[in-house]
Amino acid sequence: MSYFEAFILALIQGLTEFLPISSSAHLILPSAIFGWADQGLAFDVAVHVGTLMAVVIYFRHEVITLFRALFASIFKGDRSKEAKLAWMIVIATIPACVFGLLMKDVIEVYLRSAYVIATTTIVFGLLLWWVDKNAKLVADEYQTGWKKAVFIGIAQALAMIPGTSRSGATITAALYLGFTREAAARFSFLMSIPIITLAGSYLGMKLVTSGEPVHVGFLLTGILTSFISAYICIHFFLKMISRMGMTPFVIYRLILGVGLFAFLLSA
């Protein structure tokens, strides 16, 4: 890996992690087009750290409030709306953890292909379009009950299928349940904190036991680039969806999916 490759891959990860357009669909492009080798475990950990830093710092006030409310609910019986939201995020994280433990090997062997990614990019893009056009967008994230949390959590679990997009699946599920676009995005981003933390920790443990060499320069490039690009992406996405909705991302997904199919069939 070169510094240029590290920069491009981290930039792609940061820009696509929180947009409903599938990071996996984009990350296969450099290797498919330019023949770049796999970036390795250490770099995967680095970009997870970068994107996690971005969402935690962007939502730092909400994160601090939710943590305080969560502990207050445990030790003091706090039943505030913040405590409820914190517990709903915990509940929504469980399906992905269970699904990941049970299906990780199946996904790696049978579903991590360019054709699957192209298909899911198109299918889930159309689903996002239909839900965005037909759902009643009235609720905010504080109106999330445990049934809604489980439903959105299942969507997050299904997003382990490459090409689906974690943010795309969770935002689609939240919109279907009546969340406003802004509330759906905020809940999706807050949900990402525990799942990115767990995924990064898992990769970190694999890295420690693998004995893979670590290039500090590449890691710092990955962390810094993914952090900056993800932070900017979160900010502008939240500003954009209130005015334009999800249609631009649907159109982009369709173009990307069709483009992937065209590339694969011509190769």
From Swiss-Prot:
Membrane topology, from the record: Multi-pass membrane protein
InterPro entries: UppP (IPR003824)
Enzyme class at the top of the EC tree: hydrolase
Cellular location(s): Cell inner membrane
A GO cellular-component term linked to this record: plasma membrane
Main localisation: membrane
GO terms, biological process: cell wall organization; peptidoglycan biosynthetic process; regulation of cell shape; response to antibiotic
Pfam families in the cross-refs: BacA (PF02673)
Domain of life the protein comes from: Bacteria
TM annotation in the entry: 1-21, 39-59, 83-103, 111-131, 144-164, 189-209, 218-238, 245-265
Keywords, sorted A to Z: Antibiotic resistance, Cell inner membrane, Cell membrane, Cell shape, Cell wall biogenesis/degradation, Hydrolase, Membrane, Peptidoglycan synthesis, Transmembrane, Transmembrane helix
Reaction(s) this enzyme catalyzes, per UniProt: di-trans,octa-cis-undecaprenyl diphosphate + H2O = di-trans,octa-cis-undecaprenyl phosphate + phosphate + H(+)
EC number: 3.6.1.27
One annotated GO molecular function: undecaprenyl-diphosphatase activity
Keyword Transmembrane helix: yes
Function per UniProt: Catalyzes the dephosphorylation of undecaprenyl diphosphate (UPP). Confers resistance to bacitracin.
Family to which this protein belongs: Belongs to the UppP family.
HAMAP family for the chain: Undec_diphosphatase (MF_01006)
Further comment: Bacitracin is thought to be involved in the inhibition of peptidoglycan synthesis by sequestering undecaprenyl diphosphate, thereby reducing the pool of lipid carrier available.
Name assigned to this protein: Undecaprenyl-diphosphatase
Gene, per the UniProt record: uppP
